[in-house]
């Protein structure tokens, strides 16, 4: 199972986190599948690669609590729901994507 979670970077007392897609069995600093963004809690800056996040969420990846909150602020889940609604409407009409 794949999770979207934070990977700690930076130096002592000055943490910066990468948001990564990683296998559940890997440790926090383990090898990730893909980097999908970063989060700086001190400057309160966030960057998300939205297509990559939507790809992993569409494939069944589960975000951790903190990544879920960050994604919620960035309104990622609204985009995911819009994409799912379009796909459902097209499949009902006979189009398969």
Swiss-Prot record:
Cellular-component GO terms for this entry: chloroplast; mitochondrion; small ribosomal subunit
Keyword match Nucleotide-binding: no
GO molecular function: structural constituent of ribosome
Keywords of this entry: Chloroplast, Plastid, Ribonucleoprotein, Ribosomal protein
One record GO biological process: mitochondrial translation
The keyword Protein biosynthesis is assigned to this record: no
Source taxon at top rank: Eukaryota
Residue spans crossing the bilayer: none
Compartment(s) where it occurs, according to its Swiss-Prot or TrEMBL record: Plastid, Chloroplast
Main location: plastid
Family: Belongs to the bacterial ribosomal protein bS16 family.
Name of this chain's protein: Small ribosomal subunit protein bS16c
Species whose genome carries this gene: Piper cenocladum (Ant piper)
